[in-house]
Regions:
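Short alpha-helical segments and helix-capping/turn motifs at coil-helix boundaries
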Residues: 48-51, 60-61, 131-135, 294-307, ...
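Short, motif-level signal for alpha-helix interfacial/capping segments enriched in acidic residues
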Residues: 59-60, 374-378, 468
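PAPS-dependent sulfotransferase catalytic core
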Residues: 334, 428-520
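Residue-level signal for cytosolic alpha-helical hairpin/rod architecture
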Residues: 39, 398-401, 512
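Short coil/turn segments at secondary-structure boundaries
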Residues: 56-59, 133-141, 204-209, 386-387, ...
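ATP-dependent adenylate-handling active sites, centered on carboxylate activation for C-N bond formation
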Residues: 69-72, 89-91, 152-153, 172-432, ...
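Charged substrate- and nucleic-acid-binding regions of tRNA-handling and nucleotidyl-transfer enzymes
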Residues: 526
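Cysteine-centered catalytic environments shared across enzyme families
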Residues: 1-271
């Protein structure tokens, strides 16, 4: 379990040799992989590199450390921010935690919390709260790529009275620089990917634990599981959740069977996990849309109930894969002028979000989408996992991540490099259908306008459009939200009652009007975004 921490720094904080200097959640990779080595590695990095220590530490983590050398507390997380770190400054001192729910409960004992208008509209627009904002005032998040410092009195852990938290940028997304041939780029991707797999799976192997590896119909989790298997990590437990007999289910099942892995499937038919609002909010603090977490929470609970928890390792995912080796952009154009709301799932409240000061400043559209949708968004989709075990994706590996983002878009767009790497190095992995295209990745593509897809994919998309309108209305989609809301009347009725029962906890009239409008008139995605806020209101402001 990724143990969380909470720390209160005030005038009562004393210098005590027994007082912990390091508070930490997550893990770093070390050669021997024992707790003593891990602790020593982190402390040595912080003593030698200070605020830049995360650039020396591989893993998924967040923490706070008192440096007696610099007389300051250092707040830090891994460069890609896979573990969030939250803080608030109150009259009685600093409150800092990796656990949003715990932090809120501690602050509630001192003062009430209110909704942050910016955080509120970010969640309704994107499905997650972004950058340094959170859903509730006065809590902030340490932004990704930054360390924070709070000055202390000389040789004391007590903060200097009236001190502020200073943030220091230590990591930026790399700019496109290297120009390699497709073959050379694929060769380097393979070296870096295998090194990342070895680090992560060796951690489980050294602890004699069974790696949990997610599988779906996509390429990202497939390559994580496949290459780990090829490298000798064959004792895997593949887990999959999807509508029964959807392509995600069928493809994942076939791969797990062919590799002779253990297999755990959880059907999502009926959408019942949409009712797990309260359980998920306890893990997320309402800072990310709840429904994506509900599947993970339920399937991990099922697996724990069937196995000894002590034998289970990390959850290995393919998180961020197709936007690292591929790209968020589908063409080779990477504009420097773009909408602040580019990448949002709902554009209903663009004006309100901009009026409340939402002004992300990234130098191009790919960086904007990678930071907001990828690092601040998709990464938050694992918050429910951390309550049970740790999680890692080989695509988080900073060497692989930086290498790929430096490659020109002509190599990465439309999965050009991704499919080349698979077909050249792992041709057997290309024998399975890719859920996104409904055909194999070796199928010839046909360009119509700016889009290039296999003919079979064009035809399937046309038929789906005529028959269902949206993929989320198709019962054979992995998570068909709109289909569930339309057909599962009992679930929809319970969610409607939940929404209406707690709506008045949004005490600001305009915000209350807007969230009701989104829930009443929105599509499935917009409805669950609205419900995520309501669940947080129930838990934190009632």
């Amino acid at each position: 379990v990724a143990h969380s921490f909470y720390l209160h720094l005030s005038e009562a904080t004393t210098h005590d040799r027994g007082l912990k200097r390091l508070h930490f959640t997550g893990f770093v990779f070390v050669e021997q992989q024992n707790a003593t080595d891990e602790y020593r590695l982190i402390v040595d990095a912080l003593n030698h590199h200070g605020i830049h220590a995360p650039l020396q530490l591989r893993g998924s983590y967040a923490g706070i450390y008192w440096s007696s050398i610099d007389n300051q507390w250092i707040l830090f997380s891994d460069p890609l921010g896979t573990k969030p770190l939250y803080y608030a400054q109150l009259p009685n001192g600093w409150h800092i935690s990796s656990n949003y729910d715990r932090l809120v409960q501690e602050i509630k004992a001192v003062q009430p919390l209110t909704f942050s208008a910016k955080g509120f509209y970010q969640l309704l627009s994107y499905g997650f709260v972004l950058e340094s904002d959170t859903l509730l005032n006065p809590i902030k998040r340490l932004p990704i790529g930054y360390s924070g410092t709070i000055g202390t009195l000389n040789n004391e852990q007590k903060p200097i009275p009236g001190s502020t938290l200073n943030t220091h940028k230590i990591y930026s997304l790399p700019n496109i620089g290297s120009s390699l041939s497709l073959d050379d780029a694929a060769a380097q991707v393979d070296i870096l990917f295998r090194a990342a797999i070895k680090r992560a799976f060796e951690r489980d192997a050294k602890q004699s634990k069974i790696p949990l590896v997610s599988l779906s119909g996509g390429l990202d989790s497939r390559m994580t599981s496949w290459i780990a298997h090829e490298m000798g990590y064959t004792d895997q437990l593949n887990l999959c959740f999807a509508q029964k007999n959807s392509l995600d289910h069928i493809i994942a099942r076939d791969i797990a069977k062919d590799l002779a892995h253990k297999w755990h499937f959880m059907p999502l038919d009926g959408g019942e996990m949409l009712l797990d609002l309260d359980e998920v909010t306890e893990h997320t603090g309402g800072n990310v849309v709840y429904y994506g977490q509900a599947h993970s929470r339920r399937i991990l609970q099922e697996i724990i109930d069937k196995n000894s928890p002590n034998t289970l390792g990390m959850l290995h995912t393919g998180m961020l894969g197709d936007v690292v080796i591929g790209s968020y952009l589908q063409t080779t154009e990477n504009p420097v002028n773009f909408s602040a709301l580019s990448g949002a799932t709902s554009s209903r409240f663009t004006k309100e979000l901009l009026n409340h000061g939402f002004k992300p400043e990234y130098e191009n559209l790919e960086h904007h989408k990678m930071m907001l949708r990828g690092l601040y968004g998709m990464n938050m989709g694992l918050m429910s996992v951390y309550a049970v075990t740790d999680s890692y994706s080989p695509f988080y590996d900073i060497d692989l991540f930086n290498f790929c983002l430096q490659l020109p878009l002509k190599l990465r767009a439309e999965h050009k490099l991704y499919t080349h790497w698979i077909t050249q190095y792992y041709p057997d992995a290309a024998n399975y259908i890719w859920e996104r295209t409904r055909t194999k990745i070796t199928a010839k593509s046909l360009r119509i306008g700016s889009k290039s897809m296999p003919l079979q994919t064009w035809l399937w998309k046309l038929v789906e459009k005529i028959r269902f309108g949206q993929p989320t209305r198709n019962p054979r989609y992995m998570t068909p939200l709109d289909y569930w809301f339309a057909t599962q009347t009992d679930v929809a009725s319970q969610l409607n009652n939940y929404f209406n029962q707690y709506l008045d906890l949004i005490d600001e009239a305009e915000m209350r009007y807007h969230i009701k409008e989104l829930y009443t008139n929105g599509n499935g995605k917009e409805k669950v975004q609205a419900l995520s806020v309501i669940a947080a209101a129930k838990r934190y402001v009632s």
